[in-house]
Amino acid sequence: DLDFHHYYGLTELLETWLKTQKYTIENEQDILALRKSFIDDNWEKVYDYTVTLCHNHHLRLHSIYGKRPKLITAEKQKRWVEKQRQKYGMVR
């Protein structure tokens, strides 16, 4: 089984962005209205800083960095994944 992982967790990223922009979300319409701006402002973190991992390594990553890793751990997560790939090879 393969899992998709964002080094910059979307929940943490969105919450930080909302605070920075001084936006509040009250309902689904608010989310839809802000979605494009959020993605435009965070394109790389949403789409480029991602990885596909086997399920076991994904669970291990979260056991180390937590269920909702802090944004400041993104580079550490990326290095950890690179080390795992050096040790175990790429998932095929």
Q: Positions of the model-derived regions?
A:
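Extended charged
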Residues: Q29, K45-V51, H55-R92
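Histidine-centered nuclease catalytic patch
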Residues: D1-Y49, K67
